[in-house]
Amino acid sequence: MKEDPRHIHISEYSYPLPDERIAKFPLPTRDQSKLLIYRRGEVSEDVFTSLPGYLPQGSLMIFNNTKVIQARLHFRKETGALIEVFCLEPIQPNDYVLNFQQTVHAAWLCMIGNLKKWKDRQLKREMTVKGFPITLTATRGECKGTSHWVDFAWDNPEVTFADILEVFGELPIPPYLNRDTEESDKETYQTVYSKIKGSVAAPTAGLHFTPRVLDALQEKGINLEELTLHVGAGTFKPVKSEEIEGHEMHTEYISVNRSTIKKLIDHDGCAIAVGTTSVRTLESLYHIGVTLAENP
């Protein structure tokens, strides 16, 4: 009898990972990273530029084209206390594109750093965006699990919420890097094919691809398709429960074009998902399809 996955102990997934084995910064040329090969029971190493040589001709590769947003907003209180408001998911409006286009007001579900210091309902910060001086106000609303509803308001209709994030926000890099965000991260912590803004973390399996690797894949006859999954708060939220059942999972936004779905259905060869975000999008797509077929 298979074990109920809800009762799997988190401790079974613990393993040592020395800090010195974690690269704090990427290589100057991202496709020169190491490539681990497991083939016919043998393990070997290569460089990432060699990837096309290991993949079957005629394969279909699926990439996640999400783009990381500068989701960390910092407010300094008069007492000197620093409070971080980490934007996770748009609430009003709940569509990412519409929310980024908002002027004057937008609401997000946020994680709050140093919450105990946020005693008044509102935080304010003055800034200059696109040459306009504005005052950004953050009002804390109801608590939803470990997150809070936060209303953002500003006093200039020429400025969008996307503008505010671009100027005021900080890119969220993984906590295991144990370093502050740097200006170079705005480029290196994005995939070269990132397009659709919305993630709070990069789909890291795609970070090693470069235009020359993508060109080499296509030259071999490998078809490239894209979908979107905006990586959510689960990336940063530690697992504190002893069993999987006790861990709160966050939902994530996905979008797959009709043309991509048709290619997936019609494709008879090998389908290769780049990273776990692409995998769980495809798994969710299948689940949604089965559910709709059974309950039209």
Set out the residue ranges of the language-model regions.
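A cross-family signal for N-terminal binding/gating loops and helix N-caps
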Residues: M1-P296
